[in-house]
From Swiss-Prot:
Name by which UniProt lists this protein: Uncharacterized ORF2 protein
Protein's organism: Torque teno felis virus (isolate Fc-TTV4)
Alphabetical list of Pfam families matching this protein: TT_ORF2-like
Lineage: Viruses, Viruses incertae sedis, Anelloviridae, Etatorquevirus, Etatorquevirus felid1
Length: 105
């Protein structure tokens, strides 16, 4: 047992909030940098958080060489809620270089 702490002392119920201060400063810096190039007001709007892949909510993408394909999860939004999976795939343009013309937000 350490000489600086004994069992008769109470635990520190008010820990140093250095980490919380550092996190708050980091968030302020990220927010300030984000405002330089975007006017949405909240940098967290650009993140999509992962969700479990459900087979009935996936589009199976098969490559040119065939195979079983890859299940690609999609999120139903108000704009795309009525779309059929085939319509979603048809709306994605694939260029000659193989890059999808999807827009990041």
């Amino acid at each position: 047992m350490s000489a600086s702490h004994s069992l008769s002392q109470s635990p520190n119920l008010h820990p140093d909030f250095t980490y919380k201060r550092q996190e708050a400063l980091w968030k302020q810096l990220v927010s300030a940098e984000h405002r330089k190039f975007c006017s949405c007001g909240d940098y967290t709007q650009h993140f999509r958080f992962p969700s479990p892949v459900k087979e009935d909510e996936c589009i199976r993408v098969v490559g040119e060489e065939g195979g079983d394909g890859v299940a690609v999860s999609y999120h139903v939004t108000k704009e795309s809620g009525d779309e059929d999976p085939e319509e979603v795939m048809a709306s994605i343009a694939v260029g000659d270089d193989g890059d999808d013309d999807l827009e990041l937000w």
